[in-house]
Amino acid sequence: IGYTPWNDNFPADKLPEIYRISEPEKAVGSYVFEPSNGYVAIEAEHYFKAVNAPETEWTCIPYMGRTLSGMALMPYTKNTDGAALSYKMKLPEGVTKVTVRVVVKSTLAFRNLDGHRYNVALDGGEAVTVNFNSDLNEKPENIYSVFYPTVASRVVEKKVELDVPASEDGTHILTLSPLDPGIVFEKIVVDFGGYKPSYLFMNESPSKREL
């Protein structure tokens, strides 16, 4: 609320009307993103749908990401079979290929020493498997070139090239599926020509929720 003079003679002060959600814990997901300047940037917390593995639950960790939060399947002691986060977006007509940048927390390979993996797929197509921390260790060939810089930056960014299937309404669903525990997703950027490298991985794109 702004004022020009301090002697406004208001007949009454009125509190703006407040609308409360009856079950706020259920008011999650269902985000649909619009492209902005050649890319779609999404905070991991703003998923369209989350599927849990048996005895697990997708958990939002506030402030873990550089810009908002992180999403992790917990507890880490359980298997990740069947778990997934899906992100719904619209892409412009004529886009046939995208570069998907997935930003995760710099988790060490505590469960699988060969590295922790996740799958990336678009519209149910063939998934691409990403091993994001196989070289995140103190071996002589990695400690100065990979380990120390990654520990300092606290994130791991990986890129995946995907074909874009035809869509009648331009809507597409990107799915991230953890194959190992301990993966914390922070941000996803779907680039079709407009991405510019930045510390915050671009501003989040416009979105609305399907209720």
Each PLM stretch: what is its role?
Residues 1-211:
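Extracytoplasmic
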